[in-house]
């Protein structure tokens, strides 16, 4: 089988989308599908190619070896990427979605049908609109696709192997379609604030707090980042006289640090030794 350089396991904290639907693994899987599908170009007639997005997405596609859903909120991601800092590997392999899969699917279909584009350059080249979920006309187009998906009992190929109950898909289509009907935009996400209203005429946007009990990060959760604690060397204990050929011991006291990078230089200022401890 194919070997990967690194494996990262993600345990997601899912909450409700702003339209009330529960975020789930299908949102993650469809997001990955989108990156893989739009990050490659099979030929010059490939309809899932965008002049701006595809070159960017292709960088991630080249390193993703595979994924393995473990349970309803856990997934293993295999990538050909390594870094001495494991946090960097996790960041590189991270999968997430900031919108429900059905919104992404409707956007994709509108672009494939030639009604819109994912980028400014693509819109200019094809003489179509640069799709924006906040613009009422584009939102109504998305709503039309959602209603069509519901009527035709459409199940995205990206999710066929993971979910078969059409009631689930229909509830997603209906909830997002109703959101557009009420709010006149299709911006649905999962953060602590949601877009309540947008008026192009008055150039005004109304944003409200998303007061939902499923949101995982309660008030004050991120407060520790408000006061940054910088690493600092508080004291250094070293002998006044150093004798050549004898062992040298230097004690260093620090605060808010878990490692120290030290280096030694000779009389000419050239570095002779460097090590992270």
Language-model features: locations:
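The feature preferentially marks the first beta-strand/turn patch immediately downstream
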Residues: 1-277
